């Protein structure tokens, strides 16, 4: 088996077979090799010697979950045995009596002659494993033939040491060396490279193979721990870590328990390995300094590391492995205590103890708990019974299983045969199964616990299913009991129902009272639902009969009211079965159906009307098309004008009488829209033709002139005479409008220039163009005209208007003066008349006063003389003041009126050529309005003068 290539990491279970027979130790005559556990006869064997005690071994890959153990020099350890038929290929097997004795071991009595020679390892890692094989058959008590064995992890280097048994039996013992790589491919065989796209890959120099995945040999203990689980760690772009399960496709933010446990165990194993290496002495050092082997046991130190395939690491469990050693004379065996080994006695470990302690690390990563469980298991097996070296262990051979699944199934069948319950603990189960041969189907405690936990989970599921099925059946029987009870109704209470069913076994089959009540409540709810459904069905039948009755009543129409016929309906038996509200609802539903029928009839009638209206619209469209062909309807036709011509036609009247759809105006606009579109296309073509041939439109052209000018272009484009006439009218209108616009612009410039001339006081009636040109030639108005002759003509017109204004002003001043003189004379005449009248009145008053004052003539005459003199003086002064004010007022009126006339004349001349608004202003300033204003002023003056006269005459104002 050692010559075969290493198995793949996917192999989970591999049965061991007995080693090949016929391979003998070289050069001495040795007996054939037998598997561990075989009890050979006592034969005298020559003392072998080690050829390569620390040679690195080439082993099979470690099965996932294979535990690895560390031992110290003071405690025993159970190590995984490695079965191989590899024989020693180098070194001498002859004894060396002159070799120095070994030191560092606890011995008593004379030292043994060393039967072994320790040779340092000098072979490369690629060479096959060299195990020390004595010339006699090796035997380990308690290890059955073809037992399931697992190899040591890939990063562990061990050598097997077999001390001599004088009785002819030897036991291979694993001796610890520095931790190394025990895999067929060492870390030095792998090289890391980087591909063109930046990805890293690994190349094996020995196998000439490349791999994208990082080999186990190059992994750190932490990476091996991660690789042993189904979880893989990733990092988001934000730097947050999450974990992905490769089996269940599950992602989570928190670190899974198994991954966390694997990392902790890897860290713990690494720390304890370093401590173990620091506290132990290499075995080669003792071999070099000692010539006699004076030990009764050889302690194996196996550093624990992470499993190469599963990544699970275990806590170091230290135990002493006792190897029987005999020397003459015979020494009675002594049982050691607390790991201490006697000087002269050899101890052996019972086969069950070795079997149960072959590996103590479980797949779930338990460390200290596994140690405690293993100690309990050892106590169950007999508390590590030790027997004399000469006793032969009667070991029952375990069954061999082809696969790991079969072994696990056998172990589960053992649990099932013992009838392990789902609430049993491992310690409780261990007492029942430890003596069964199927207990050894799984080698490690972790595998057994894993299978035990799986069995408990399955057992719990089975028990839960059985419990659920039993409860389901009890519930069904309970419901059946309720259905069979005739006294049960929807109004029955639970308290009364309990008294009815308390003696029934089906009632007692449901354990929990709460469940019984829930089942009862559910049944009552279902019973109520059925009763409601039955009542609803009866109600539907009554409503159907009532509906048939309503349909037979001919006096019910769509507009019939309920209040008028409800008394007539109540006499029928089909109405008495229903409530009043139900009868009302049924009546309303029937009325709604009648209304729907009427609406359907209306819809059909409306459809007929719609078709007739559509025919009317089609006839009107035909009429419009005829008018378009005749030229009556064009793109420039307005609806109001066209409607006057159509209003008496039957097609128009038919469409106008339509109640829906397009109106006659809508149809007219649809046609004119198409005509306008064609008109604009023809107009664009004509304008492009005129532009290409450089034809300028003249406002004096007739239609024939325009048509002849573009006749050559009309041969390529068919344009109707109607559209061509419309195009002509539009172009001529545009030309005329442009000319009018230019004329208005020139008139505006002339007005602006004339207004500019008004602003210069230097320009008078006597000014000429040559002298005044320098005043206006820098202005914007003058430059806007651009033609000096036009500006000069406007200037001369302005001078002429000034001359006319001056003449008119002089004439008006003369007329005003004559008028005022005439008014003054008339006013004097009126004043004289008034004065004479007042004199006469005074005379009459005087006469009356004379008659009254005859008796006081003397006194009265004196008083009258004084009074009359004073009044005469006062009247004379007032006459002088009035004349002075009148002269001053007349002069100021003449000046104001002349200035106002000048301003009016200037405004009239500046707005002589304006628009309607300017004309209206001109009209407001016409001579007629001036005469009216003058009349108003004269009236005011006359009233003012008359008021002054009244004040002068004295009696009122004074």
From Swiss-Prot:
Residues 949-958 have a biased composition (Acidic residues). It is found in: Nucleus. CDD domains: WW. Residues 184-217, 225-258 form the WW domain. Residues 805-857, 867-880, 897-908 have a biased composition (Basic and acidic residues). PROSITE patterns: FF, WW_DOMAIN_2. GO terms for biological process: mRNA cis splicing, via spliceosome; RNA splicing. Residues 404-458, 471-526, 532-593, 611-674, 679-734, 736-801 form the FF domain. One of its GO terms (molecular function) is RNA polymerase binding. The keyword Nucleus applies. The modification Phosphoserine is found at residue 387. Residues 40-54 have a biased composition (Low complexity). Residues 1-54, 89-132, 158-193, 270-292, 328-391, 805-958 are annotated as: Disordered. Residues 909-924 have a biased composition (Basic residues). Its main location: nucleus. Disruption phenotype: No visible phenotype, probably due to the redundancy with PRP40B and PRP40C. Highly expressed in roots. Expressed in shoots, rosette leaves, cauline leaves, stems and flowers. It comes from the Eukaryota. GO terms for cellular component: mediator complex. Baeckstroem et al identified PRP40A in a Mediator complex pull-down assay and suggested that PRP40A could be a plant specific component of the Mediator complex. However, no experimental evidence has been brought so far to confirm this hypothesis. Belongs to the PRPF40 family. Interacts (via the WW domains) with the phosphorylated C-terminal domain of NRPB1 (via CTD domain). Binds the phosphorylated C-terminal domain (CTD) of the largest subunit of RNA polymerase II and functions as a scaffold for RNA processing machineries. May be involved in pre-mRNA splicing. This is Pre-mRNA-processing protein 40A. The gene is PRP40A.
């Amino acid at each position: 088996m050692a010559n075969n290539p290493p198995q793949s990491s996917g192999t989970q279970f591999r049965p061991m077979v007995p080693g090949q027979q016929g391979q003998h130790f070289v050069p001495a005559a040795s007996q054939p090799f037998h598997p561990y556990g075989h009890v050979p006869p006592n034969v005298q064997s020559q003392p072998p010697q080690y050829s390569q005690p620390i040679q690195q071994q080439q082993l099979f890959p470690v099965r996932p979950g294979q535990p690895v153990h560390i031992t110290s020099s003071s405690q025993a350890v159970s190590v995984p045995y490695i079965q191989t038929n590899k024989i020693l290929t180098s070194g001498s097997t002859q004894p060396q009596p002159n070799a120095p004795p070994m030191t560092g071991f606890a011995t008593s009595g004379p030292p043994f002659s060393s039967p072994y020679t320790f040779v340092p390892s000098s072979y490369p890692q690629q060479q096959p494993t060299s195990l020390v094989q004595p010339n006699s058959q090796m035997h380990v008590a308690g290890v059955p033939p073809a037992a399931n064995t697992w190899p040591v992890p890939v990063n562990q280097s061990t050598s097997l040491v077999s001390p001599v048994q004088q009785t002819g039996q030897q036991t291979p013992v694993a001796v610890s060396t520095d931790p190394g790589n025990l895999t067929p491919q060492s870390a030095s065989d792998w090289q890391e490279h980087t591909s063109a796209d930046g990805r890293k890959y690994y190349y094996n120099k020995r196998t000439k193979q490349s791999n994208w995945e990082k080999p186990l040999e190059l992994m750190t203990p932490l990476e091996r721990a991660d690789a042993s689980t189904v979880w893989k760690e990733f990092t988001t772009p934000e730097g947050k870590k999450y974990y992905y399960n490769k089996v269940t496709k599950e992602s989570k933010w928190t670190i899974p328990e198994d991954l966390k446990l694997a990392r902790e165990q890897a860290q713990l194993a690494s720390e304890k390995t370093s401590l173990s290496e620091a506290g132990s002495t290499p075995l080669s050092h003792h071999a070099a300094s000692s010539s006699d082997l004076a030990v009764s046991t050889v302690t194996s130190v196996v550093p624990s590391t992470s499993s190469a395939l599963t990544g699970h690491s275990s806590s170091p469990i230290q135990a002493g492995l006792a190897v029987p050693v005999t020397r003459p004379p015979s020494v009675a065996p002594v049982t050691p205590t607390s790991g201490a080994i006697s000087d002269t006695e050899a101890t052996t470990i019972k086969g069950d103890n070795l079997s149960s302690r072959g590996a103590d690390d479980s797949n779930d990563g338990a460390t200290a708990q596994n140690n405690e469980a293993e100690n309990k298991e050892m106590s169950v097996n007999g508390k590590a019974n030790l027997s004399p070296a000469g006793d032969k262990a009667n070991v029952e051979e375990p069954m061999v299983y082809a696969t790991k699944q079969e072994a696990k199934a056998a172990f589960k069948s053992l649990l099932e045969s013992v009838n392990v319950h789902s609430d049993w603990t491992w310690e409780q189960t261990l007492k029942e199964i430890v003596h069964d041969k199927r207990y050894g189907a799984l080698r490690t405690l972790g595998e057994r616990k894993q299978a035990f936990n799986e069995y408990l989970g399955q057992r719990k599921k089975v028990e839960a299913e059985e419990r659920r099925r039993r409860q389901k059946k009890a519930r069904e029987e309970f419901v059946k009991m309720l259905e069979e009870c005739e006294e049960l109704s929807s109004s029955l209470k639970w308290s009364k129902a309990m008294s009815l069913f308390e003696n029934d076994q089906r009632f007692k089959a449901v354990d929990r009272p709460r469940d019984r009540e829930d089942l009862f409540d559910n049944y009552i709810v279902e019973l109520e639902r059925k009763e409601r459904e039955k009542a609803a069905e009866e109600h539907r039948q009554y409503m159907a009969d009532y509906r048939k009755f309503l349909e037979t009543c001919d006096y019910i129409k769509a507009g019939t009211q309920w209040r008028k016929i409800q008394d007539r309906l109540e006499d029928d038996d089909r109405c008495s079965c229903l409530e009043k509200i139900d009868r009302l609802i049924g009546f309303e539903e029937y009325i709604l159906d009648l209304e729907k029928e009427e609406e359907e009839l209306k819809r059909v009638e409306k459809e007929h009307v719609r078709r007739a209206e559509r025919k009317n619209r089609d006839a009107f469209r035909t009429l419009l098309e005829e008018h378009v062909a005749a030229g009556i309807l064009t793109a420039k036709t307005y609806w109001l004008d066209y409607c006057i011509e159509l209003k008496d036609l039957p097609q128009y009247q038919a469409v106008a009488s339509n109640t829906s759809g397009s109106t006659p105006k809508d149809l007219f606009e649809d046609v004119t829209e198409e005509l306008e579109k064609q008109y604009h296309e023809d107009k664009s073509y004509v304008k492009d033709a005129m532009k290409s041939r450089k034809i300028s439109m003249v406002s004096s052209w007739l239609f024939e002139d325009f048509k002849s000018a573009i006749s050559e272009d009309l041969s390529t484009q068919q344009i109707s005479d109607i559209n061509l006439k419309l195009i002509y009218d539009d172009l001529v209108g545009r030309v005329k409008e442009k000319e009018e616009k230019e004329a208005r612009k020139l008139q505006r410039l002339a007005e602006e220039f004339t207004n500019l001339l008004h602003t210069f006081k230097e320009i008078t009636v006597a000014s000429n163009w040559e002298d005044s040109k320098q005043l206006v030639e820098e202005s914007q108005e003058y430059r806007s005209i651009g033609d000096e002759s036009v500006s000069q003509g406007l200037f001369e017109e302005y001078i002429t208007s000034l001359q006319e204004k001056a003449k008119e002003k002089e004439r008006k001043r003369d007329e005003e003066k004559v008028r005022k003189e005439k008014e003054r004379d008339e006013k004097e005449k009126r004043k004289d008349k008034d004065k004479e009248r007042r004199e006469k009145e005074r005379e009459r008053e005087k006469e009356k006063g004379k008659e009254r004052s005859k008796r006081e003539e003397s006194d009265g005459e004196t008083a009258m003389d004084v009074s009359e003199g004073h009044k005469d003086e006062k009247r004379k002064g007032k006459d002088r003041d009035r004349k002075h004010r009148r002269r001053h007022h007349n002069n100021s009126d003449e000046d104001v009126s002349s200035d106002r006339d000048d301003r009016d004349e200037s405004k009239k001349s500046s707005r002589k050529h304006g628009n309607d608004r300017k004309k209206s202003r001109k009209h407001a300033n016409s001579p007629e309005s001036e005469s009216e204003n003058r009349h108003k002023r004269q009236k005011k003056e006359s009233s003012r003068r008359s008021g002054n006269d009244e004040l002068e005459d004295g009696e009122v104002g004074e």
